[in-house]
């Protein structure tokens, strides 16, 4: 009888304790949430090297090249003429006048390697607002 009062058999718990598992999962979730914006902001764009490029024929129509040399810095090149450091409005006016003079003019956009790709997109939008429907991208940096 003394045995039953003092030292009874303890029942073992057969449940799984998931609190440590949840702690680890929440810490991992916080780490991923903190690093996800950093990963998406640091994506670098490497321009491909074109192995099969087509040469632009300049028999009758010399190509009009819009060079993006920096943020908001545009240069329009037609044959030997270089119009440097043009504001976006003047680029649109120059491209529009060239396009209206000859709709078959070839337009190319080139950018320096250190220029953010967003500036190339802005140059594409400028040519689109000037009425140009087809634009080529130069694969060799300027």
From Swiss-Prot:
This is Tol-Pal system protein TolR. GO terms for cellular component: cell division site; membrane; plasma membrane. It comes from Escherichia coli (strain K12). The Tol-Pal system is composed of five core proteins: the inner membrane proteins TolA, TolQ and TolR, the periplasmic protein TolB and the outer membrane protein Pal. They form a network linking the inner and outer membranes and the peptidoglycan layer. TolR forms homodimers. Interacts with the N-terminal domain of TolA and with TolQ. The gene is tolR. Disruption phenotype: Mutants lacking the tol-pal cluster suffer delayed outer membrane invagination and contain large outer membrane blebs at constriction sites and cell poles. Tol-pal mutants fail to complete division and form cell chains, and fail to process denuded peptidoglycans at the septum. InterPro entries: ExbD, Tol-Pal_TolR. It comes from the Bacteria. The keyword Magnesium does not apply. Belongs to the ExbD/TolR family. There are about 900 TolR molecules per cell. It is found in: Cell inner membrane. It is a single-pass membrane protein. Changing residue 23 to E: No change in TolA-Pal interaction.
């Amino acid at each position: 009888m003394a045995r039953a009062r003092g030292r009874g058999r303890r029942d073992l718990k057969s449940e799984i304790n998931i609190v440590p598992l949840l702690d680890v999962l929440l810490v991992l979730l916080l780490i991923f949430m903190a690093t996800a914006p950093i990963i998406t902001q640091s994506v670098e764009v490497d321009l491909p090297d074109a192995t099969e490029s087509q040469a632009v024929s300049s028999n009758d129509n010399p190509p009009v090249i819009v060079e993006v040399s920096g943020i908001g810095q545009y240069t329009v090149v037609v044959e030997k003429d270089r119009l440097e450091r043009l504001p976006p409005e003047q680029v649109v006016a120059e491209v529009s006048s060239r396009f209206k003079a000859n709709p078959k003019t070839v337009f190319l956009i080139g950018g320096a390697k250190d220029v953010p790709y967003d500036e190339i997109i802005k140059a594409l939008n400028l040519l689109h607002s000037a009425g140009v429907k087809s634009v080529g991208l130069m694969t060799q940096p300027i």
